[in-house]
């Protein structure tokens, strides 16, 4: 009688172990978004009638999961300071993974621009941003500055 009880318990334990090993596991992917602000300003100084590019600012993105992939990337141009009639033509963003995108932009402050060329690329890295503008004045040296930020929407299972 005792061996029968031991055999039943043994088979019960084997059944439980079998179910534990064959049951599928559910793993949840991590997703999220994070905003990174440039530590300096993009600034341009132009002579009358001149067109040119601003200085480039760098934004280091770190702290995301190692396998984080971009699902959306936006650039907020930030606050603006200016003197004169400087008209923006475009904003350029590049990443350390080799992707670059030029976005048409007329210079609005705190404008959110959505990129498309960074989708499915690695999120961690260094991003550089600059803008191109034209001095519409025919008389004076003019300036314009912005302090941009980027928001990275990411997923670690793409």
Q: Where do the PLM segments sit?
A:
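Bacterial N-terminal signal peptides that target proteins for export
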Residues: 2-14
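Cysteine-clustered segments with highest specificity for TGF-beta superfamily mature ligands
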Residues: 95-158
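A short beta-strand element within beta-rich, extracytoplasmic domains
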Residues: 68-81
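Extracellular acidic, Ser/Thr/Pro-rich low-complexity tracts
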Residues: 63, 79-81, 135
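Short beta-strands within extracellular/lumenal beta-sheet-rich domains
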Residues: 48-64, 110-115, 151
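Short, surface-exposed beta-strand/strand-loop-strand elements in extracellular ectodomains
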Residues: 83-101
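Sec-dependent signal peptide cleavage junction
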Residues: 9, 21-37
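Flexible, small-residue-rich N-terminal segments that precede or flank a structured functional core
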Residues: 30-57
């Amino acid at each position: 009688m005792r061996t029968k009880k031991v055999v039943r318990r043994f088979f019960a334990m084997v059944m439980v172990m079998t179910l534990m090993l064959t049951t599928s596991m559910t793993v949840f992917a991590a997703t999220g978004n994070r905003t990174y602000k440039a530590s300096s300003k993009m600034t341009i100084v132009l002579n009358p009638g001149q067109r040119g590019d601003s200085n480039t600012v760098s934004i280091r993105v770190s702290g995301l999961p190692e396998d984080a992939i971009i699902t959306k990337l936006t650039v907020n141009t930030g606050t603006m300071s200016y003197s004169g009639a400087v008209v923006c033509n475009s904003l350029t963003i590049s990443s350390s993974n080799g992707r670059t995108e030029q976005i048409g932009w007329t210079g609005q402050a705190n404008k959110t621009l959505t990129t498309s060329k960074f989708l499915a690329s690695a999120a961690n890295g260094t991003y550089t941003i600059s803008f191109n503008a034209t001095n519409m004045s025919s008389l004076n040296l003019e300036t314009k500055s912005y302090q941009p930020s980027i928001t990275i929407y990411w997923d670690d299972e793409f």
